Amino acid sequence: EIFLYREQHMGLFFRKNTNICDINKLNFKLFDKNIYTLFQENIRKLNNLLHDYNNIAIYGSGAHGNTIITFIDNSEKIKKCFDLDIRKQGMYLQNSSIIIQEPNIENFKDLEAIIIAAPLYEEEIIRSLREKGYKGDIIATEKELKII
């Protein structure tokens, strides 16, 4: 069973089946060309959105945040990462020199855009960024790539 939150994948749970199944009758889909194409289109769109920015941050140091930097054409434009988890603050995104910081007005200085890399919490993050005084562009990623 798959349980969704805001149409996002939250987890995959398996239920033990006491009936013996024939492995040859199970219908697995290992690769979907359409998903690959859509992914590539979104990477192109993200790079187009980021083209004119020079000082960018990523909000979210989990799997999305660590992965997104590998797909950005000019990753040197990513100056910092934000995360509320104090255990991560002061650390770095994997294989990078991008430091993870507390999201506050002091750390927002000189930033032109923040990419939300925590889609399940996007609405709360956007609201929090604005409440904390961030005035630059926010790039939303939950349902579609767009500048807010």
Region spans (language model):
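Hydrophobic, well-ordered beta-alpha structural blocks that scaffold small-molecule cofactor pockets
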Residues: 2-148
